[in-house]
Amino acid sequence: MAARSAPSCHLRLEWVYGYRGHQCRNNLYYTAAKEIVYFVAGVGVVYSPREHRQKFYRGHSDDIISLALHPERVLVATGQVGKEPYICVWDSYTVQTVSVLKDVHTHGIACLAFDLDGQRLVSVGLDSKNAVCVWDWKRGKMLSMAPGHTDRIFDISWDLYQPNKLVSCGVKHIKFWSLCGNALTPKRGVFGKTGDLQTILCLACARDELTYSGALNGDIYVWKGINLIRTIQGAHTAGIFSMNACEEGFATGGRDGCIRLWDLTFKPITVIDLRETEQGYKGLSVRSVCWRGDHILVGTQDSEIFEIVVHERNKPFLIMQGHCEGELWALAVHPTKPLAVTGSDDRSVRIWSLVDHALIARCNMDEPIRCAAVNADGVHLALGMKDGSLTVLRVRDMTEVVHIKDRKEAIHELKYSPDGTYLAVGCNDSSVDIYGVAQRYKKVGECVGSLSFITHLDWSSDSKYLQTNDGSGKRLLYKMPGGKEVTSKEEVKGMHWASWTCVAGLEVNGIWPKYSDINDINSVDGNYVGQVLVTADDYGVVKLFRYPCLRKGAKFRKYIGHSAHVTNVRWSHDYQWVISIGGADHSVFQWKFIPERKLKDALHIAPQESLTESNSDESDSDLSDVPELDSEIEQETQLTYHRQVYKEDLPQLKEQCKEKQKSATSKRRERAPGNSIRLHFIHGYRGYDCRSNLFYTQIGEIVYHVAAVGVIYNRQQNTQRFYLGHDDDILCLAIHPLKDYVATGQVGRDPSIHVWDTETIKPLSILKGYHQYGICAVDFSADGKRLASVGIDDSHTIVLWDWKKGEKLSVARGSKDKIFVVKMNPYVPDKLITAGIKHMKFWRRAGGGLIGRKGYVGTLGKNDTMMCAVYGWTEEMAFSGTSTGDVCIWRDVFLVKTVKAHDGPVFSMHALEKGFVTGGKDGVVALWDDSFERCLKTYAIKRADLAPGSKGLLLEDNPSIRAISLGHGHILVGTKNGEILEVDKSGPVTLLVQGHMEGEVWGLATHPYLPICATVSDDKTLRIWDLSPSHCMLAVRKLKKGGRCCCFSPDGKALAVGLNDGSFLMANADTLEDLVSFHHRKDVISDIQFSPGSGKYLAVASHDSFVDIYNVTSSKRVGVCKGATSYITHIDWDSRGKLLQVNTGAKEQLFFEAPRGKKQTIPSVEVEKISWATWTSVLGLCCEGIWPIIGEVTDVTASCLTSDKMVLATGDDLGFVKLFRYPAKGKFGKFKKYVAHSTHVTNVRWTYDDSMLVTLGGADMSLMVWTSEVERHREKKNCDSEESDTDSEEDGGYDSDVTRENEISYTIRALSTNIRPMFGVKPHLQQKEPSVDERQGVVRGSRPPVSRAPPQPEKLQSNNVGKKKRPIEDLVLELAFGYRGRDCRNNVHYLNDGDDIIYHTASVGILHNVATGTQSFYQEHNDDILCLTVNQHPKFINIVATGQVGDSADMSATAPSVHIWDAVNKQTLSILRCSHSKGVCSVSFSATGKLLLSVGLDPEHTVTIWRWQEGAKIASRGGHNQRIFVAEFRPDSDTQFVSVGIKHVKFWTLAGRALLSKKGLLSTLEDARMQTMLAVAFGANNLTFTGTISGDVCVWKDHILCRVVARAHNGPVFAMYTTLRDGLIVTGGKERPSKEGGAVKLWDQELRRCRAFRLETGQVTDCVRSVCRGKGKILVGTRNSEIIEVGEKNAACNILVNGHVDGPIWGLATHPSRDFFLSAAEDGTVRLWDIADKKMLNKVNLGHAARTVCYSPEGDMVAIGMKNGEFIILLVSSLKIWGKKRDRRCAIHDIRFSPDSRYLAVGSSENSVDFYDLTLGPTLNRISYCKDIPSFVIQMDFSADSRHLQVSSGCYKRHVYEVPSGKHLVDHAAIDRITWATWTSILGDEVMGIWSRHAEKADVTCACVSHSGISLVTGDDFGMVKLYDFPCPEKFAKHKRFLGHSPHVTNIRFTSGDRHVVSAGGDDCSVFVWKCVHTPH
């Protein structure tokens, strides 16, 4: 048997030859101990040059490709490739893991960097988005993540001189990042004119915002901020791969093989050209450089490491060499010396000294080398080449002996015969050639039996035979030297092989897994002396097997280090070492062999620590004679806990099914019943597959679990309390060491752990997100702060939690085999143990990971299955109980001894003060001393010991014990049979609680007149239970077979029981003795019922699809009901005992007449009239409504009707108990729903008086007793469950504002499209007309400076002649006229005691001073702000949070985000990027001000809680499937908040990281209905007020509606505000002003009395969107974009802010001489604004939407163009209409006075411009018009002489017309000579540069040239204002851009004197005034 066990010897990695120089950079450093750290393959190497020693870090599972050194230079971070790559932070001194960072990146980790103090680490992924991620590496926690770039990133670094700043570079880019909150925001480096845009390979940050970077062309680029300021050209002649900053300066290394040293200001110090040194060679390329003091380390592309001493820089010292890039396949060992030979595709053959660990010879060949061999005397070295040739060298001087080329394909293997006469050469073309060595390698034979390429060869010891392996896995033997194939078995038997390197053959069968035919083992080598075999495979693993190894699937020891294919492996000549070589990592590993005899002394080389450890699960180092598993444990390991449907899937399933439901629910659904039930008592305890799940609390109550319920049992009062927070089976339970807190873990797709308080039964924290399928073990740490949990997924994931915060601290894959227990070390909180099938593992925490070591059994025993474990009295000691009844005693990871404790498995053990207690399958509890030497006392659990006070009966003696707990003088015991017993220390046993044993429970019957019930189960027992307060099992009887149904006779004396074998029996109901039994059927008896009245007949239904009817008195079968097509599920009698109703598995509802059983067809109408004795049917019209929407995935299994026929209780497959009104007609009836059972509810029955409902859980084996609570008697305590479907259909009415806000879709700026329906080719893509100069053939710039030709006239008439023209260099936002009230709420607040107000419009936050009207702005948002709130906590004064729209495809800058900022200095304190798609619609601070709540606009309306200062997301959950308008924290809480929205109000609690919600309950008030809720406010004692769409305000106590303030307003209540200082509440609604009413009301704290305020706005309806209360003032924001201050005393209104109500604001005109301007908008108003006074002076209501507006040249008249085609001229002085005219049907787009005031030009969307002569008076007759305009008119400009007009049209064409004739002017030369009065055109060569590259879908919408004629501003569809020089004929001209507007700037103008720019917004209905900053003289 030993042949299949793992060998007991060991390999230890001693040396690695190589360094990874290819595809990596910056991966070589000095540590603080002056050692050198680098990596090769999958191993981190720490090399000490002084001692010439290597240490290895082996925590990675694949190629390492990046490395960073911690600033203190002891810790190293390394990143690897792979599907789930991770980062390890490790100690270079001890080479132990300190932290593991995982679960974020994919593909690989390309770069790493520590920040200045080493607290944070940044990593860059290899995924398509090159994700950048910042970690708090000690905690293993990701702080922030963002997409890095679309192309590869090569280097990243923290700016060591500025906090929270980073720089990254790569393919054609450099990016400067800032980290704020959880947001990483990049700015691209601007190359500008200073240097070419190119790939940057490396960088270093310096002081004063300087960054130095190395470019691909060998230049160094120097950056200041984000701008390139200079380049150092030709620093290297080719790409600069590495840059290293140190105290003295910078070192750079490049592809040119040079190292350059620079001082701190980047002036060159010196250059070292490595190619010119003696070790140098052509093509040497530097990949990594590190400068420390007077030493420089250099790593090259070809895997060399040089050390250079600065003052002897021409003598670099080679400290490491390896093979260069190219696959490495050839390996041979010298037959007599400790030498190894390798040959590679890099064409070099190298000889290594295994003693000195050095390269001693190297020879370059002409071809890639694929195999090598040294002959027996060590003189010749034969090399097989990739091209099929063969070269033989002399070993001593590497001179060539012979070169032969007989083959065209690669030589894969060659070997000299043991006697040295022959050389066998195996080729890719499947032949083997034999050469005679003495005949100068003449070919003497050939073997041709193979059909595939030759892979391995071996000679026999006598050199007469050769064995080969080929690619198809065949093994063939040949006679030598002729090459004849040997087939005779006899001949084969006698062969002895000189070496064994073949992978096929009897001796190596065991190296292959049992059932695989794969070809992934590349090389083996047998060690005959040590009887071990070493193998190398494709997965980077080197394994040791016993040799010979005959049986498949042998056990082994495995060693990792190589990253991918290990191509070859050989023993050294004396078997001291194993040499292995890596194909892709081209490294050579040298392993020391430690034979068995030395192992005894060498315990220190026990299991090696690693994340994927050597002695890993598959290596199963156990002996193969593991005892068979105990039957109980085996049964348990086969449980899967998988569900067809998980509870988490229900919401999605419901949504999918709702589509179908739409049609069905057009009818009104029946209301839910008034009655409720409450869980009262559960008979049952889950012992059959759980252990140690039963505890005493500190007050002596008992806590345990059954089904989905945590139970707290009071043994004095025999009562139970329940924790009902779980929704599926609980599998484990642990109790907190200090408090009465309990942790329970459940089954689920994403299963959760609930930590709850046994006193209040409230959840404290819910942990989820890291396990799958279920949680099988939990344990608290000794200080109670942490919790460990184990999942039941395939790798049994272990998670360590900080449970209060709900944070995952660490996670690791536990084991492939089932884990039964996890225990945390009471002395060291970072250590824990897990135990399970065949293993015991010791773990320690490393950052985000855990590192495990298997318990080391040594010679003491075998790896047994462990069922329980505890820690002892020191941190090293641990004890575990095995499946064979032993207790194992461990010190550290070593097994010290074993003690026999029980017969059969030890299931539970606990440590006491002075000893231990254990319990086992043998039903014995044993007490032990503190060293497990003596057993002090045993207690056997026997019926004889049962004390008189027991609540029930013991089913059998010595039941298997699964849980033990200790109390004062008592031991609490839980058994497999579902019993909980209390053992007194003196011996007597009291039974407290019991339930059925393992097996499904289906049969349930309640007694006709007593409070008792009977159950029968697959556990083969029939039990009678007392439902009265004594709650116990009265009687039990064992049956031969399990049973599925039972029924009491009407007189209660007999009990009929149907069994699973088709028989049934009748028993005496008191004694349970048999009366009579029958066996007429083969299949399960599924239902059994006595006929009502005297009980004359008994109907027996079976799965054979028959119902048999028996006469009870005569004991004869009198009838059979035939005709069912499927098994029978339910039967009911009618009240006369004449008719049977039958349900079948095929969902048929059938009727039979008794006693004969004749089938009857009864129309459904008649069925309702029949009076039934019982109703347990689930089919038929009367109960159509009990089938859920998701009926496809779940069956209703049982129902039962109350005797008053009012309430129908049902049970279903998902574990829900529901109550419906009866009859439940119509589909999908409303119900109340209760969760306690975990899966199928198999039966439900009301007791005889309907006072209780009894329910049975099938697989959870529990019997639950519920008490019924009728509506009237109910105290305020409400016991409806959360999910009950009791919502009403109506939502309280319709309101246009609410509907619009609900349906609005927010586009993000980046996706905005044209606001005008333009068509045609964009200007910058049009074919350009040649200019005058070009037409005349003049080369640009070549005109003579003095010319006879008249000078070209000015393009634009300059108005400020005489002044020096000063260009405008910047715009600063000075005023914003506008407020977003139309679809936001509660977004105007007081600050600074009411001196300032804060609000928002577009994407700016505005701080507005009430007294002066001055404004300051927060402009960091890059898109529209949707919500705003102010932190009320005094510690966070003036802190504001604003949320914006966005698009969350990835967490980039366009993601929706919340900014938290200081309102006074506008500093951003934190940015929270959300995964809410679309935007953030509500924000709220918690009471302490530390937490922030945000609500998303995504379809789930996700609610998220943040710790905003850290940028950490604490919790997140879908809020509701319809729009949530507001969510607010309770003003006194950090954990409670309320959300309101469409037909929804929810009361939330934050528990750890989980959000728990309760729906508002309406059931206590008559006729209350769930309306759409719009606002929320709070009162003391958990009162909540919500404003509704109908104008009512609902008042809630906790989550129950307690009253309604009817018609608080006459329309929707949009806003509510709670004043913290006095508790008064302000409400704002939508209503028409009336004498007594008002749109704003101030209420007392209880909302009983109020005072109304009217807003004197003159509107027909006032619609208030925001209210806030300060000292004696109320601040109101309205839908009409006004902000009004109302005095509380005098009710006086003061309008602070005005704005347009609806946009776009198309019309904009500035006064010719004063700082006034006009705006005209869709809302039908024209408004006059005063910039100096910062306010609106006047407004005119036109009654129609206005599109354009214009001042006359003198400023005395205003022309207004309307959307309906009309235009109006007003006199400015009186605002009287001077004239109006409507000649067009469509909108007027532009209107202009000519500079001489004579003409008015009117441009419309009818592709025309009309001219009117104003001198003819106000009749306004059209004098002519322009024809042939190809599209609608956008803008027009007159020439300075009023004789021409330029027109821009909707097809991107500009035309010039003569005035007033309207004639089209086409002569370009003439056009070029026109001087224009104004320029607002977006078209024309002069403004070609304003069109950007990114305008496929969006346009430049407006432009305006300054009065000085040298500056130009534009507005575009993205909402940007841009400033250019004028003219700008070059494409993509340089400009400055200014953000602030929402998408679409509709118009823009300079004011007189170019003092300001005014811009008008489309979507934001706001006008912005920008101050122009002129360049100084």
UniProtKB/Swiss-Prot annotation:
Belongs to the WD repeat EMAP family. One of its GO terms (molecular function) is microtubule binding. The lineage of its organism: Eukaryota, Metazoa, Chordata, Craniata, Vertebrata. It holds the Pfam family Beta-prop_EML. Residues 1326-1337 have a biased composition (Basic and acidic residues). GO terms for cellular component: cytoplasm; microtubule. Keywords: Cytoplasm, Cytoskeleton, Microtubule, Repeat, WD repeat. It is found in: Cytoplasm, Cytoskeleton. It comes from the Eukaryota. Disulfide bonds: none annotated. SMART domains: WD40 (SM00320). It comes from Rattus norvegicus (Rat). The gene is Eml5. This is Echinoderm microtubule-associated protein-like 5. Residues 609-629, 1274-1299, 1323-1363 are annotated as: Disordered. May modify the assembly dynamics of microtubules, such that microtubules are slightly longer, but more dynamic. WD repeats lie at residues 59-100, 104-145, 148-187, 195-233, 235-273, 280-321, 323-362, 364-403, 406-445, 449-488, 561-601, 725-766, 770-811, 814-853, 861-900, 901-940, 996-1035, 1038-1077, 1080-1120, 1236-1276, 1420-1471, 1475-1516, 1519-1558, 1568-1606, 1608-1654, 1699-1739, 1741-1782, 1783-1822, 1895-1934, 1940-1977. Highly expressed in brain, especially in hippocampus, cerebellum and olfactory bulb (at protein level). Residues 615-629, 1281-1294 have a biased composition (Acidic residues).
